[in-house]
């Protein structure tokens, strides 16, 4: 079973995907961390984030063992990843990696921006997670402060809105709800309620398939 979870930054899709994977005994891939890894490498080397050729080279030589690097979770790297992810050659370089991950038995949960529309268009379950931008900014602020990082909520909100704009309007694989995806508004749900709502969607889809 492949579960595709898409949505904008800080919508809660990552936590939801991780919990769903644990619940169903599936592997989990936060596809955003792949782009964060590329962005981090470019930032560390002092390279231009919009240098598509160099970024694609980095994308083709990623080491999955580094994906849990805490530095990838910084606000700076997240913003840089939004820029890098708009580069067509980078997305092309990472497409095979993501599809191969999803295809391994018994299945996987992938979360990102284009899982249900591009990476795994035939996923059994697709969920599109949304939340009010102000609520997303507040959550991201609390996350940053919990890590001991300074965080300006107004600046984070402005960045989230800018990222939404880039993600939704990029030429390749823009952020959008797949036609057959279930919409889950996570604005006023705590973690447990959000996960429960996602599990309910998965179970409803599975029950529907069993009846066919």
Curated annotation (Swiss-Prot):
Principal location listed in the UniProt entry: cytoplasm
One GO term (biological process): pyrimidine nucleotide metabolic process
UniProt binding sites for ATP: 7-15
Gene Ontology CC terms, in alphabetical order: cytoplasm
Single annotated GO MF: CMP kinase activity
Catalyzed reactions: CMP + ATP = CDP + ADP; dCMP + ATP = dCDP + ADP
Localization, UniProt: Cytoplasm
Cited Pfam families: Cytidylate_kin
UniProtKB keywords: ATP-binding, Cytoplasm, Kinase, Nucleotide-binding, Transferase
EC number: 2.7.4.25
InterPro entries: Cytidylate_kin (IPR003136), Cytidylate_kinase_dom (IPR011994), P-loop_NTPase (IPR027417)
Family, as annotated: Belongs to the cytidylate kinase family. Type 1 subfamily.
NCBIfam families: cmk
Name of the protein: Cytidylate kinase
Lineage of source species: Bacteria, Pseudomonadati, Pseudomonadota, Alphaproteobacteria, Hyphomicrobiales
Designated gene of the protein: cmk
């Amino acid at each position: 079973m492949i579960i595709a979870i898409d949505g904008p930054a800080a919508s809660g899709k990552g936590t939801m995907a991780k919990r769903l994977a644990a619940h169903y005994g599936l592997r989990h891939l936060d596809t955003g961390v792949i782009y964060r890894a590329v962005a981090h490498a470019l930032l560390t080397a002092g390279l231009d984030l919009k240098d598509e050729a160099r970024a694609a080279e980095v994308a083709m030589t990623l080491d999955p063992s580094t994906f849990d690097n805490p530095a990838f979770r910084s606000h700076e790297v997240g913003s840089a990843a939004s820029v890098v992810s708009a580069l067509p050659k980078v997305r092309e370089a990472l497409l095979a990696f993501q599809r191969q991950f999803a295809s391994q038995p018994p299945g996987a949960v992938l979360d990102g921006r284009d899982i249900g529309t591009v990476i795994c268009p035939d996923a059994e379950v697709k969920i599109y997670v949304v939340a009010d931008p102000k609520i997303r900014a507040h959550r991201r602020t609390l996350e940053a402060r919990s890590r001991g990082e300074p965080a300006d909520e107004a600046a984070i909100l402005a960045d989230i809105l800018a990222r939404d704009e880039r993600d939704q309007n990029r030429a390749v694989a823009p952020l959008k709800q797949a036609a057959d995806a279930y919409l889950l508004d996570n604005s006023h749900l705590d973690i447990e309620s959000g996960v429960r709502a996602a599990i309910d969607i998965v179970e409803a889809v599975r029950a529907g398939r069993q009846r066919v």
